Swiss-Prot record:
InterPro entries: Herpes_U55 (IPR009479)
Gene name, Swiss-Prot/TrEMBL: U55B
Name the record gives this protein: Uncharacterized protein U55B
A family per Pfam: Herpes_U55
Length: 430
């Protein structure tokens, strides 16, 4: 196997010849002598087959938090597709900011919120008065009169006392931010949507379900839990006052999520989400199921890339998750088994859109094609073609490649008086 790298080590290219050991095998895992790590921030290490037009291409990804040995798992071992060329390269990751997570279907009075939803409800008789706190541009008070509440069939069923279920009602009020020019200028001046925190609500039965900022309107969705009276009516507040505070912008290089569910677990490194089964499920041998996960993320500056976990009990395929949509994936079991909420399916990583702009479609293998274009006269124009995108090599994170030592060399080294036990840090070049 021959190995080559870019001069500034933005990628690693490997040519794999056909070996007789491939004969009669469905798949094989190759381990290389080289070790790779990120020079700066943690990255997502991706591998793709360059000559995918001649075969079923493969695409894989795994987190690169520290030094790792280069490893490749091959499934198509037909002799006619070899020699095969494979690229290893890294994409920078966005950090997950779990401090501004919306928790749907929970009381979110003390949670910071941000969200965008396509449809809005309108009420004719509702009146809203908005005032701005003096000397505090980021705080406003919203007072609503003649509130019209509507039954909500999508909220969870709860009971205040056993045998007395509460009914959930919802409403929405619209605030025209054009009436608050200072707020609009100072809070909405950036490209990011503002993040809101609820300081206080006048009625204890009311909570904020979610907020939407679709300029120039700020939509505030409220929820109220109430008991049905003997006359089959509801006791709900007619008026309500909210005190809201806004953050000017989201912290750069971070992403806000609405996926803080039991099956979406934010990892301790705050750079990925592990996806687990929502419920206990039974699989027959060879059975495929499509899973739908409630919860969205909102950040059009990032691509959410789902990567199957290699240790999962089921098989799935890498895919992209679009903003403001529910996450779905198909899983297949190769045997009859029972899975629980403790069984992992895969992980979700967030990649900046300026690095990767093409939507991933697992139904077309041609979209996996990768190619390197090098220009000796103008190195700045060197580019990687991946997922139908042209990505300049200079935009990729720097990698450090280290040559691994054989067991015999390590044994000789341990018996000598040389104190340098670290692997060589010399970079491999063309």
């Amino acid at each position: 196997m021959s190995l080559a790298t870019s001069d500034i080590l933005k990628y690693v290219q490997i040519e794999i010849p056909y070996k007789e050991e491939f004969q009669g095998k469905d798949n094989v895992t190759l381990l290389f002598d080289e070790y790779v790590q990120s020079k700066t921030e943690p990255v997502l290490l991706l591998s793709a087959e360059i000559n995918s037009r001649n075969s079923d291409s493969f695409f894989s990804a795994r987190p690169l938090m520290e030094e790792q040995q280069l490893k490749l798992h091959l499934k198509n071992l037909n002799r006619h597709i070899y020699p095969s060329k494979v690229l290893f390269f890294g994409f920078p990751l966005l950090k997950i900011n779990s401090s501004i997570v919306i928790i749907p279907n929970h009381d979110v009075k003390e949670q910071e919120q941000m969200g965008v939803f396509p449809s809005l409800i309108r009420f004719k008789n509702e009146k809203v008065i908005v005032t701005q706190t003096p000397h505090k541009v980021n705080e406003i008070t919203v007072t609503m009169f003649n509130i019209e509440w509507k039954l909500s069939t999508y909220q969870r069923s709860i009971e205040r006392t056993p045998g007395h279920p509460l009914t959930t009602l919802c409403t929405v009020c619209s605030v025209n931010i054009n009436n608050l020019p200072f707020w609009f200028h100072d809070v909405r001046s950036g490209s990011d949507f503002p993040t809101c925190k609820v300081f206080s609500i006048s009625d204890p039965t009311v909570s904020v379900l979610k907020m939407i900022f679709s300029p120039p309107l700020l939509e505030i969705y409220l929820r109220c839990y109430t008991e049905v009276t003997k006359n089959n009516t509801y006791m709900v507040p007619n008026d309500c006052m909210l005190k809201l505070g806004f953050v000017n912008e989201i912290i750069p290089n971070e992403i806000s999520l609405t996926v803080h569910m039991h099956y979406f677990k934010i990892c301790s490194d705050k750079r990925k989400i592990d996806v687990f089964f929502q419920d206990t499920m039974l699989f027959d041998e060879g059975e495929t199921k499509k899973l739908h996960f409630k919860g969205t993320f909102y950040n059009f500056n990032a691509n959410a890339l789902y990567v199957p976990d290699p240790n999962s009990k089921v098989q799935s395929i890498a895919s992209f998750w679009s903003p403001t949509t529910s996450f779905t994936t198909k899983v297949t079991s190769d045997r009859s088994q029972r899975v629980t909420t403790n069984d992992i399916i895969g992980s979700i990583y967030f990649i900046p859109t300026h690095i990767l702009r093409t939507k991933f479609d697992p139904n077309y293998t041609d979209s996996f094609a990768a190619e390197i274009e090098l220009n000796s006269e103008d190195p700045e124009s060197d580019a990687l073609y991946f997922l139908a995108d042209k990505i300049f090599i200079s935009d990729l994170p720097d990698l450090i490649l280290r040559k691994g030592w054989s067991a015999r060399k390590k044994k000789l080294q341990s018996g000598s008086n040389i104190n340098n036990h670290a692997p060589s840090k010399s970079r491999l070049r063309f």
